[in-house]
Amino acid sequence: MVQGLPGEFEDYLYRVIASLYRYAERLVVVDYPSSPTRRSIDLIVSLPGSRVVLIKAIYDASLISKKEVEELSAVANSLGVSAVIIAERMGREDLLTGVVYDRYGVNMVNLETFENFVSGREEVYVTRYKDIYTVSISSEKLREKRLEKGLSLGHLAYMLKTSRKSIYEYERGVMSPSVEKAEKLVDILGEEILEPIDILTSPRKPVSKRDFDKPEEALVGEKLLELGFKVSHAKRTVVDLVAGRSGEEGVGSRIMIVVKRSREGRERMMSRIMKGVKMGSILSSSLYAVVNREEKSLIKDIDYTKTIVKDVREFINDVSRGRVEENEE
């Protein structure tokens, strides 16, 4: 059940959900907070090939702020999963099918493009960053084909009416050609130089989010950082802290933590915990409720959610000893 969405937001989210059910091995809807424009994550999807994706789905992407997108990216990065925005418009402009847009460092595509990608029907080669369209090419193939043709950097640059430095940067993989230049390169060197874009790989390095709200969050977050975890603080989704160890799998490699928020009552915290359990099941993440000793009585009957409840000192002692528990099934 998706709650609290105005009509057009609800319609589009259900459309995305209906589409992804055809391709996903598992799918979890994250309907917290209730406002779709304040929520960083709408869906968590497990795709074939063991690829897990955090998705923000909104018809008009201009309605979500940089803060929501940066949190989406940071949470995905800490957990070692992918992040994608699915939208149809950016203000008055329709998103083009077959184009990957860079929205604050997260790949953004329309639903048709995402369907084509996950189904394998059609590969994507064009990226738009700000107002510039570029084409993805293989730097290695470009160099290989240029040498096969017996072309120097200068000669190829002359044929493209560009600089020698630009060709050099293409071959280093630090710059991509415009659509016009890419078409000329394909005419000269062949389609083998094109390289499909992996929509599930972020175009830029994610920004870490560690602006902790409470002393408990800071204590827990700093200890996890000290132990080698990537840590992000979240304000616009169910959990408050996420942490993961790069390249590791299994128990203890991913942790999500719910911390009691200011003026948050028992029912609201329990609701977040139950939603967090669903998130953890698809992310293969342990879920902790970290509280102070006085707050333990607030959630004393939490056992039915299979959540691990610790006060701050207990949690820090456990993770310091490498003891990260797994939620019961």
Curated annotation (Swiss-Prot):
The alphabetical list of record keywords is: DNA-binding, Transcription, Transcription regulation
- SUPFAM superfamilies, sorted: lambda repressor-like DNA-binding domains (SSF47413)
The record's SMART domains line, in alphabetical order, gives: HTH_XRE
Write down the superkingdom of origin.
Archaea
Q: Name one GO molecular function term.
A: DNA-binding transcription factor activity
**DNA-binding region spans which residues?**
153-172
Instruction: Enumerate the CDD domains for this protein.
Output: HTH_XRE
> HTH cro/C1-type domain: which residues?
142-200
Q: What is this protein called?
A: Putative HTH-type transcriptional regulatory protein APE_0778
